[in-house]
């Protein structure tokens, strides 16, 4: 990101504050009304990890997409940049796919296949660069990059969806790993994509207040697929693909463990043998069922049962570690790709 003068920097700052404020305030003030509405309509699910098994409203996806859409539309009319549109349409399509799955349990193949559609706006609007930033330089891969986009959006969308198993994990994970992504986009990407990353980050900050332990609302598939797909779209349009992969390593590892153990793409609600079990004092323990899939949670519980909040904090520590690795990678890229110049 290159600034020709101080006025450009000031303008980016003003736009950044504007984007952050719209996204945050929309989600923050609309979410309590959504919680009340969902409770009134009986759109709730039980939180099985709590002693009283409270009924928690779901989904939060509609409020998230409202805040993100409103902000990105405003940003588009301020910048008229096709990358903003590509990120917006990717987020909307991912949300629609998720809300369908929220309303009706779809087969395991539905989300990864349907999310291919969410990748199309990036391709159709040409909102990508075929020069892939690597750690020690970049690679020009025009033919390979298109299939990579078609793979990346479904993978990242489902990765965030798969790790959303405990209070606050999906939103907290996006916040932690969003920091290196924003920094990378600021350095290697464009002003417009950086503004979009602020939209995602501050919308998620507002949502985390309601999603953190103990959750007042769950994101649902519409929320997690939206967050994951938008994260992926920002990484692609902001020339920060490798940084995103490094930051998301714990979540990617979780998906890899799950798929390698069940050996097929399956909806998590179809799994009969759960990877974790509840003790009498409502702590989570690793399942002893040989048929249960291997997941990140199950591995973290090998040393013994943990409370839900303790387990969430362990996942966040992994996210912090992978994000630090991503930040180190940014420093290396900064010197090898840009020669130490922004």
Feature map (PLM): residue ranges:
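C-terminal membrane-adjacent module
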Residues: 15, 289-342
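Membrane-proximal soluble regions of multi-pass membrane proteins
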Residues: 255-309
